[in-house]
Design a protein with these regions (language model features):
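Juxtamembrane cytosolic interface motif at the C-terminal end of transmembrane helices
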Residues: 17-21
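Compact, glycine-rich, soluble single-domain proteins
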Residues: 22-147
Length: 147
């Protein structure tokens, strides 16, 4: 009986740890001539996890958040160790606004208009590439449907 309980406990811990360690789907996006390899957070659990607990991210990698509805979504940086910039996008992938975010803060960074997507990149990535509000992120149409 103790072996069964131990095995059940290990199985439960594995299931609880799985979302944080699970591979998210990836998508290739473009911003002007710049290629982005983005993990896709299309369900509630992956949107809540986001980039929490990450210690590093490659220069042209990011995370695309796919929301079920266009709203004035907000992001924060609780348990996020990387300084990030977030671009809020409309349904066609047009950048509404870009916000810089500091690690481990709970300040809200919100879309200035209803957004269907948010793209998080290393802090300063958009500014460094000359990417500004009004420009379009390509490849958004290939993103999975939100859940």
């Amino acid at each position: 009986m103790p072996r069964i309980l131990f095995a059940a406990g290990v199985a439960t811990l594995s299931v609880l740890a799985a979302p944080a360690n699970a591979q998210m789907p990836r998508i290739e996006l473009t911003a002007g001539f710049h290629r982005i390899e983005a993990e896709v957070a299309a369900d509630q659990a992956s949107r809540m996890q986001g980039l929490m607990m990450r210690k590093s991210m490659a220069a042209n990698q990011g995370m695309l958040f796919v929301f079920p509805q266009a709203e004035r979504h907000c992001m924060w940086m609780r348990n996020t160790f990387l300084p990030l910039s977030v671009a809020f996008l409309d349904a066609e992938g047009r950048i509404l606004n870009i916000e810089d975010m500091e690690p481990q803060t709970e300040d809200n960074h919100c879309a200035t208009a209803p957004a269907r997507f948010a793209l998080e990149m290393n802090k300063g990535w958009f500014a460094g590439k000359g990417i500004k509000p009004g420009q379009r992120i390509g490849g958004i149409e290939k993103s999975p449907r939100p859940q």
